[in-house]
Amino acid sequence: MGQVLSDESSRHLSHEELTHELASRFADKCFTSLEIYSFKDVFKSLADNQGGIRYLKEDTLARFLEIPDILHVSPVVFQMVSYIGAFPFLQNAPAVLGLDQMVMVVVIMTQRHKRVLAKGATDRAKLLFKSLAVHDRTASEAAVAAEKSSKEEQATQSQPRSHVAGFAVDEPVEEPEDDDDDLEIAAFELLDINDAVWQGDAPKVQGAMIPADNFRKLLMLLILIAPLNAQERLSMYSTRVTGDELDSLRATAEHILAAFLNVEKAPGIKFSQYNRVLPVCFPNLFSGFSPLFEHFLFSKNLDFTKHKGEEPVAEKQPEEIVQPLLPEPGEILNLNVLSQLSFFLPGSDLFRRLRPLYSGNKDGFSTGSFEGKVFNWRAPTILLVRGTRIDDDPRGSQQSTFAASIPPRRFPSGSKGERLTFGVYVSTPWKHTAKETFGEGDTVLFQLEPVHDVFPASRYNSEFISFTKAPTNRPMLGVGCPHPRPSQAHRRNEMLSLGSVSLLLDDSFEYGVFNHDWTAGGGAFATSVSRKFDFQDRFEIESLEVWGCGGDEEAKSQADRWAWEHREAEARRKVNLGTGDNDADRALLEMAGLVGSGRSGGSMA
């Protein structure tokens, strides 16, 4: 849709003309002809007209995307799209959302820009930060002061890595806030114009920050839309924004927000923290925007079942039956936690593909029950454990026994919250470990509550999972812990070792400890990118769950089983007995095998 412009001729074109040229190229390369038709039809049906200019308003956008009013996030989303709509001339933001501007929004929000702007394919996260950020001098100064205070606090908590002076590269340094906007530069190169001429005074990330309250609201929306696909409407999840479900949604958003900043000390998120945390802890955070904004590419006016010349028939279509995201909620895993997991694990392995394998409160808190329920599952698994923080001084004989089995505590707690939730993703089947650990390099250790944190597997240490039992070894379940030595009579009271970043559960699944030795490092899992200090959390276990992540066969079997159960339930619901036609009723019961052949079908009295 348009020939390549030369640098000389494009200098004489206005921003509007160049934007139209880029929008045309985006539409040609990123949309099918049917999607272009649908997009124009949807825009025409939604747009307001003022002075011959057609544009979208905030309430129109929110209504079309079905964003729940209770989240109060519509102004935040509109700020984002108004900024992105000005692409690539971001100095002109906020933009009036006309047809060309909405092409920019839909292409970028659905990540289809990668088909055209290969150079800036990884720069979308930075553009989203800038679309959410504000430039407020007072707030920025407060954020800088809070960050400085946090660093000083971390410095006092952490000890030097060695008594011997190390290399300068070992010392923590402030990451520079890179202002090379690859996505915009790639767009200028596509138009064959000099980006230095056109960038002007485009907003920079230095001094910019995302207000904490705005990001909290956006997180609630992102949790809600995480399982969405392009054929689903957001209104399908309306029950998740009422009552206890809404409270759970807010709580999950708070845990995620805590990964980016301490809300008690900082008013917003700086780019350095955002850029450090996002790739490790939330690589899929914004993935839900893709199906949400793809709704602009489906027009309700397109009906391929109607023949030319026929009048539309006002017939109510049967409501589509959708398989639930979870077969049943667990004590730890609910729909909000499921979305939280999808921010760093592939959603294709989670939504409608999980199966409960083991629950401590149902199956018993013992290694034997765990083995019987989990060891035969041949696909990946997710272990989740939740507990309540215990005091430094043991209370009672059981806590004292647990405290004596691990090294003395020397680190402070990692957070203020009393309830703690940890987990591990394991791609290989579980087994007993007599001498060495098991697990692959895609094993992930993580924390979900009260601070979301992710600890990827290290490339230098493979002590991922230990599951030992007597009499060969001292019984324990360890993640990132050195494998215990074989038991001997004189060693039975020997303490268990904790890894630099590790999770250990005792043999009765009564107590656990998470250790984060940031100073030492070098363990099976990487240290935290957001909490750069040493900490340790000891807790009494309340819930322990293991979920199986179905492979293709397991997922198909689960979907078929659910569909069969739904059909059977629907068939039973539709059987209407007691209508007065006894012969018809009896015939139905005989077909079901409930009467006949000696069965009376009478009362149970």
From Swiss-Prot:
Cellular compartment(s): Cytoplasm
Domain of life: Eukaryota
Any one GO CC term of the record: cytoplasm
Key words of the record: Cytoplasm
Pfam short name (any one): TLD
GO biological process terms on file: response to oxidative stress
UniProt cross-references to SMART domains, sorted A to Z: TLDc (SM00584)
Domain TLDc: 331-550
UniProt xrefs under InterPro entries: TLDc_dom
Residue ranges of coiled coil: none
PROSITE patterns for this protein: TLDC
Region (Disordered): 145-164
Function recorded in the entry: May be involved in a process influencing telomere capping.
Family the UniProt entry places it in: Belongs to the RTC5 family.
Protein name: Restriction of telomere capping protein 5
Species annotation: Colletotrichum graminicola (strain M1.001 / M2 / FGSC 10212) (Maize anthracnose fungus)
